[in-house]
UniProtKB/Swiss-Prot annotation:
Record organism: Mycobacterium avium (strain 104)
Designated name of the protein: R2-like ligand binding oxidase
Functional description taken from the UniProt entry: Probable oxidase that might be involved in lipid metabolism.
Organism classification: Bacteria, Bacillati, Actinomycetota, Actinomycetes, Mycobacteriales
GO terms, molecular function: metal ion binding; oxidoreductase activity
Cofactor note text: Binds 1 Fe cation per subunit. Binds 1 manganese ion per subunit. The iron and manganese ions form a dinuclear manganese-iron cluster.
Protein residues bound to Mn(2+): E68, E101, H104
Source organism, top-level taxon: Bacteria
Gene Ontology biological process: deoxyribonucleotide biosynthetic process
Length: 311
């Protein structure tokens, strides 16, 4: 495809108040380097854990690092879809998005190396078939479909799978798990810093996904049905993944509660419906400047911070 114009040179320039470029600026302002995180104390804490505690923590980390690798690879077709749509601001943000996902792979691998976990970890995923279904089938299928069909409906399905299920439900629940393990016990300070850093990045990622779904729903109400259907397909699968992980341990390491995790994940999934639904019937031009998606993720972060402070 030949290039005929440059969006950055049109009259008026770029709209820096549009949500994608706000997210882009936010990512630049909050840049962090994985090499700056101090993992030196984590090794001693790690060695004091029981075998089952180390097993569960390794499993959780394996699920995270494999997931971060998957999304690093699978976001590429969304960039091409934004280019085809002529949305330079979104394309700029997604380049940063992909870079951050690659950085998350780096930092989880650095932590594993720091605590001495260097064995092959694939077997940790064999016992949770729902994980493989989501990350090895549903995610790449939905994202790769954009190379053939970058339509709004296909974008909504891809965003639900990536931003609302993988990030907005499963990753948030995983961070919750790390907080329960680390913060409540005052251990693994490097992991605590790691989770804080990637959580901040992921809030921007989820906000972009919510924004993308909202603008397509505002443009065509039929896309609300696409969003609703895809969420209803994936939420049971995500909850089953959590159940499968808990079923492997008796008693559960760190005194974690499957009911608490299921309730947390369900809450994060269900509350996304209202934010997307609020775009129905709205003028499309308003959506680009509506920061509701950012506010939702900030609300989740504030709730988690208050809950941890109360421990």
């Amino acid at each position: 495809m030949n290039r005929t114009r440059s969006a950055s040179m049109v009259q008026g320039g770029l709209n820096w108040d549009s949500l994608p470029l706000k997210l882009f600026a936010g990512g630049n302002a909050k840049f962090w380097n994985p090499a700056d995180i101090d993992f030196s104390r984590d090794r001693a804490d790690w060695e004091r854990l029981t075998d089952d505690e180390r097993s569960y923590a390794t499993r959780l980390c394996a699920e995270f690092i494999a997931g971060e690798e998957s999304v690093t690879q699978d976001i590429q077709p969304f960039m091409a879809a934004m280019r085809a749509e002529g949305r330079l601001g979104d394309e700029m943000y997604l380049t940063q998005f992909a870079f951050e996902e690659a950085k998350h792979v780096q930092v989880f691998r650095m932590w594993l190396d720091a605590v001495g976990v260097t064995d092959d970890l694939h077997h940790f995923l064999d016992d949770v078939p729902s994980y493989r279904t989501i990350f090895y089938e549903e995610l790449p299928d939905c994202l790769n479909a954009l190379t053939i069909d970058p339509s709004p409906a296909a974008q909504v399905r891809a965003s639900v799978t990536y931003n609302h299920m993988v990030e907005g439900m499963l990753a948030l629940t995983g961070y919750f798990g790390w907080h329960k393990i680390c913060v409540e016990r005052g251990i693994l300070p490097g992991m605590q810093e790691l989770v804080r850093r990637i959580g901040d990045d992921e809030r921007r990622h989820m906000a972009w996904g919510t924004f993308t779904c909202r603008r397509h729903v505002a443009a065509d109400d039929a896309n609300w049905g696409v969003f609703e259907t895809r969420m209803n397909e994936l939420m049971p699968l995500g909850l089953r993944l959590i159940e499968e992980g808990f079923a492997l341990y008796d008693p559960m390491p760190f005194d974690l509660s499957v009911d608490e995790f299921m309730a947390y994940a369900s809450d994060k999934g269900m509350r996304r419906f209202g934010t997307i639904a609020s775009a129905r019937g709205r003028p499309l031009a308003e959506i680009d400047l509506d920061y509701t998606p950012v506010q939702l993720e900030d609300t989740f972060a504030d709730e988690d911070a208050r809950a941890l402070a109360a421990v």
